[in-house]
Structure formats: structure tokens, C-alpha cells
């Protein structure tokens, strides 16, 4: 189904539900340690590692530095945990911090890892990757004719970024396409405008969020004001929030975007850690989405945004922060969710800087919607399913090797066992 057709369905949904009473960062968190974590080091395992180290130093046919060996050991230790945990060297850590600021030199795509290869979660709008035809679910088999097998995501990012204007070649593997796809791209400064908007027709607004960044919450406020102005100052009768192919981003951005549409202090998301231990509870309040001590970006938000009938669009490329928003608005019956089942990345990554300037990113908890649903490996099921017939392949969290299963039970949803809703349309 084309984008224009899906928007028409969303507009119809807005009209159908307008009579219903509408109720109602990457961010580092301090890792808590339980007493049982304070165990002694496994001496025999340390001895085994030292023995392997000694054999490499004595017998490997090339000389390897101690730094390279120990970096490799740390990468292997962390990467085997799950697809999103990762050891980052100094450069990888710096690149990761840069990517959330909204401007960087590269190709413009969100990537992950599966079976030792780099996989595209979603290309970013209006970037070299999107213009070259890179699609969600593509595997990047080679970068400049060098295999990506075994690369971490931060290592792949490092290889794909570079001086603007320089050339790079990616070899892609795409499901149901027999031959490798070779694309030639030119690196560019990626200025990600995370919020776009326009009037679909008089009285009906459209807001697109492509990624959750530092200015996304303020961008929602600016978009709402601009839509009202474009509507000649008249109140809007409905709004569409498009989160399709939004790979996520900053947690506080997700909380702030949710807060723009929810009553004050409404629960947005919570976390649970090891053994179901309760973690954070984040609500629609400034202290839970303001990154610094600055002004509330929603302070002068048009009041109608809290009650206006709305539809949220999602698909299998909607991940992480976008799933938090869709889940919160769905649970509070604030919006009708339309599209296909989302990606299912419901895990919290804690970024822990290390003393040498590197960092380790660890999965430390899972996200839960206001109604205590876990997003992990199952995603958000739309209220109204509308399949995108132009989308040949759906890729989800449950397709990733080593993914964490949903703690509440039920079948993890991958590309081969999507859950259909009662309203599904073929």
C-alpha cells in the first residue's frame, strides 16, 4: 500500500474514532548491583584465559600486541550477550555520542548486528543511504569490498563514516534477491531534521518523526504551532503522527513526544531489570524529558494537542523509542495505532564509560508500556493492520540471533510469524 493510501486510511481512522472519548538517549543510567553480583572472580576461568593468551603470544604466526588481544577479548565477551550489548573503543564511543546530536558525516542509516553481519534497521530520510535505495532488512556484506563479518556495529559505523564528499561502496544482501546489490555512495554531512510536518487537507495535520534526538521534543511543539498557523488559526480536527521506519534514539525524546499528547503526569514507560526488579517510571512531566536544566520545550504547547483525535502510523522499522511512544498512546487510548507490527526492541542499554576513554554498552533492563506490556521481541500490535504491499521484507528484533525473549511469554514475532489483529486487511 502506498504512503498516500495509508495516510487516507489514517484520516478515515481519525474520523471513525473522533467521537470516542479520549482519556486521559542514548542516556546513561547508574547500574545498581545486587549483593549476589559481588561474587569472587572465577579463578579457573581466568587461568584458562591466561593460558589462551600465552599460547597466542608464543605460537601465533604473527605478533599481536597485548592491547589488540585484550580489546578482542572484551569485544567477544560483550557481543555474545545479545545483539545490542557492545564494547566500544575510544573512536566508537565518540562516534556514538556524535550520532545523537543530529549532525555527522556519513551515509545515514541505523544498523545492528545479526549472525556476525551488519544489518540495516532503517535508512534515515533524505540521506545518501535512502537515496541509494538501501532498505530496512538489508545485510551489509561488504564495505569497500571488505567483508563485514565479525564487525561490531561501532566498527562498521567507523568504516562508513568519513570526510564528506568521499566515496564508499557497499555490497548488500537482500532477501529474495539472488545476486548481491552493489551501491556506490558519497559521504555527506548528515543533518537529520527529525520532525517534519504539513497539512494533509484543511483541519488535518501530519507530523513525521524520523528519529528521536535532542531537539525532537521542541520540534513537535514547533510543528504543532506551524500546522495551526497553516490552518488559518482554526483548531485542528485530527492529526497523524508518523513513526514508520523510525529506529528510535533518545529515551527522553520519546517521553517528551508522548508528553505532548498525554495528560500531565500520565505514565509513559517503566523498566524492569534482572529478576524483574522494578526500575524507572517515567511520566509526562518536564523533569522526565528535559535533558538539561533549560526551559521546558513544551511550555507553550498548543492545548488542543492533548485532546485532538489522532492516529499513529507504525511498521516493522519502528523501533525502541518510537515503540515507547506508540505503546504509551495506545495504552492510554489516546490514539489509534495503524500499520504493521513494530520491530520489538524493548531493551534498555546502559552506556558505561570506562577509565581508558572507551565504553561498554550493556542491556540492563526491559521497557514496559503503561499497561505493563513488554515490547521486547513482540513489538506493538496495531489497532488497525494495514500492510505495506511495497515492502517486500519485514525484519524484526526476533530475527536477530541471540535476542532476548519476551519475559511475559508468548511467541516472539519475527518476519515469518507476524501476529494479525482482528481488523487485519490483506
Label each region the model flagged.
Residues 23, 195-426:
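C-terminal "post-core" interaction segments
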Residues 2-239, 245-247, 260-263, 421-425:
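Flexible, low-complexity junctional segments that flank or bridge functional domains
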Amino acid at each position: 500500500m502506498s504512503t498516500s493510501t495509508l495516510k487516507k486510511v489514517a484520516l478515515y481512522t481519525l474520523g471513525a474514532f473522533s467521537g470516542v472519548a479520549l482519556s486521559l538517549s542514548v542516556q546513561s543510567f547508574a547500574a545498581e548491583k545486587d549483593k549476589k553480583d559481588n561474587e569472587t572472580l572465577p579463578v579457573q576461568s581466568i587461568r584458562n584465559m591466561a593460558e589462551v593468551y600465552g599460547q597466542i603470544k608464543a605460537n601465533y604466526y604473527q605478533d599481536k600486541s597485548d592491547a589488540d588481544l585484550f580489546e578482542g577479548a572484551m569485544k567477544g565477551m560483550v557481543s555474545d550477550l545479545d545483539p545490542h550489548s557492545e564494547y566500544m573503543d575510544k573512536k566508537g564511543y565518540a562516534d556514538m555520542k556524535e550520532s545523537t546530536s543530529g549532525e555527522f558525516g556519513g551515509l545515514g542509516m541505523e544498523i545492528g548486528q545479526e549472525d556476525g553481519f551488519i544489518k540495516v534497521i532503517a535508512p534515515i530520510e533524505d540521506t545518501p543511504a535512502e537515496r541509494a535505495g538501501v532498505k530496512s532488512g538489508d545485510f551489509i556484506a561488504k564495505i569497500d569490498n571488505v567483508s563485514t563479518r565479525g564487525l561490531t556495529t561501532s566498527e562498521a559505523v567507523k568504516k562508513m563514516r568519513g570526510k564528506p564528499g568521499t566515496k564508499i561502496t557497499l555490497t548488500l544482501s537482500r532477501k529474495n534477491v539472488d545476486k548481491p546489490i552493489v551501491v556506490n555512495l558519497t559521504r555527506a554531512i548528515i543533518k537529520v531534521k527529525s520532525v517534519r510536518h504539513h497539512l494533509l487537507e484543511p483541519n488535518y495535520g501530519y507530523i513525521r518523526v524520523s528519529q528521536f534526538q535532542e531537539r525532537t521534543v521542541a520540534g513537535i511543539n514547533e510543528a504543532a504551532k506551524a500546522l495551526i498557523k497553516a490552518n488559518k488559526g482554526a483548531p485542528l480536527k485530527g492529526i497523524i503522527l508518523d513513526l514508520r521506519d523510525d529506529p528510535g534514539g533518545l529515551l527522553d525524546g520519546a517521553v517528551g513526544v508522548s508528553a505532548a499528547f498525554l495528560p500531565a503526569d500520565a505514565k509513559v514507560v517503566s523498566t524492569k531489570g534482572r529478576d524483574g526488579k522494578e526500575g524507572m517510571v517515567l511520566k509526562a512531566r518536564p523533569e522526565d524529558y528535559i535533558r538539561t536544566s533549560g526551559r521546558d520545550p513544551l511550555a507553550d504547547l498548543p492545548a488542543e494537542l492533548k485532546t485532538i483525535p489522532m492516529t499513529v502510523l507504525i511498521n516493522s522499522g519502528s523501533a525502541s523509542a518510537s515503540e515507547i511512544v506508540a505503546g504509551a498512546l495506545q495504552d492510554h487510548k489516546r490514539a489509534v495505532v495503524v500499520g504493521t507490527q513494530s520491530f520489538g526492541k524493548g531493551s534498555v542499554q546502559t552506556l558505561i564509560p570506562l577509565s581508558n576513554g572507551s565504553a561498554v554498552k550493556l542491556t540492563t533492563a526491559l521497557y514496559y508500556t503503561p499497561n505493563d506490556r513488554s515490547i521486547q521481541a513482540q513489538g506493538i500490535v496495531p489497532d488497525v493492520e494495514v500492510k505495506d504491499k511495497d515492502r517486500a521484507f519485514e525484519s524484526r528484533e526476533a530475527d536477530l540471533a541471540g535476542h532476548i525473549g519476551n519475559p511475559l511469554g508468548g511467541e516472539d514475532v519475527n518476519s515469518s510469524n507476524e501476529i494479525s489483529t482482528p481488523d487485519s486487511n490483506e
